[in-house]
Amino acid sequence: MASPSSLCLLTALLALVSWQTIASDPSPLQDFCVADEHSPVLVNGFACLDPKHVNADHFFKAAMLDTPRKTNKVGSNVTLINVMQIPGLNTLGISIARIDYAPLGQNPPHTHPRATEILTVLEGTLYVGFVTSNPNNTLFSKVLKKGDVFVFPVGLIHFQFNPNPHQPAVAIAALSSQNPGAITIANAVFGSKPPISDEVLAKAFQVEKGTIDWLQAQFWENNHY
């Protein structure tokens, strides 16, 4: 008969395994589960298309990720390829993105609530970093050159900035979810619909309400496409 300490250890291990299971996209239980975007079934992700109706195009996208993208007023453009563009990604737990940065452009502070990101620089130089959770809020940052790789842990606020005033930069990122999501901090806080009470934000940021009103009146650019 197992001792009480052995049972406690087994319980702890089962809890850890269960937590790891729910902490990322579900693992596939068959070769593939192509997303059926027209299915009336509501699940966490997409229902599976009948395998008899699956073909190679469900795993393909002529995305032209080698083609430069036009940037916007924050100086970047994120072209994400996820399950919405390639239905064959359903249950596979991965996406990819091309990020173009104008000179002095940035991918502003944001989080991916459902994915870790690994980024590699294809052209140019990037100053990148992420901030840990409360209470320390430690910044881990690095200047990356062509060919360098950096990891942003799941859910943490992170950013990329092109410090070169004359040359653009390009990066490719892989994300550990078929649908990683993106929450741009400034957009979410100051551009929410309906707006967050200026009294709440003034207290949170320790500024006058007039400053918050001005910030909420701005157009907050979305650079994720």
Curated annotation (Swiss-Prot):
All copies of domain Cupin type-1, residue ranges: 63-213
GO CC list: apoplast
Keywords: Apoplast, Disulfide bond, Glycoprotein, Manganese, Metal-binding, Secreted, Signal
Source species, domain of life: Eukaryota
Primary localization class, coarse: secreted
Glycosylation: residue positions: N77, N136
CDD domains: cupin_OxOx (cd02241)
Signal peptide bounds: 1-23
PROSITE patterns: GERMIN
Disulfide bond is among the record's keywords: yes
Coiled coil: none
Chain residues that bind Mn(2+): H110, H112, E117, H158
Keyword Disulfide bond: yes
PANTHER family: GERMIN-LIKE PROTEIN SUBFAMILY 3 MEMBER 3
Subunit structure as annotated in this protein's UniProt entry: Oligomer (believed to be a pentamer but probably hexamer).
Family membership noted in the UniProt record: Belongs to the germin family.
Identification of the protein by name: Germin-like protein 8-6
Organism: Oryza sativa subsp. japonica
Phylogenetic classification of the source organism: Eukaryota, Viridiplantae, Streptophyta, Embryophyta, Tracheophyta
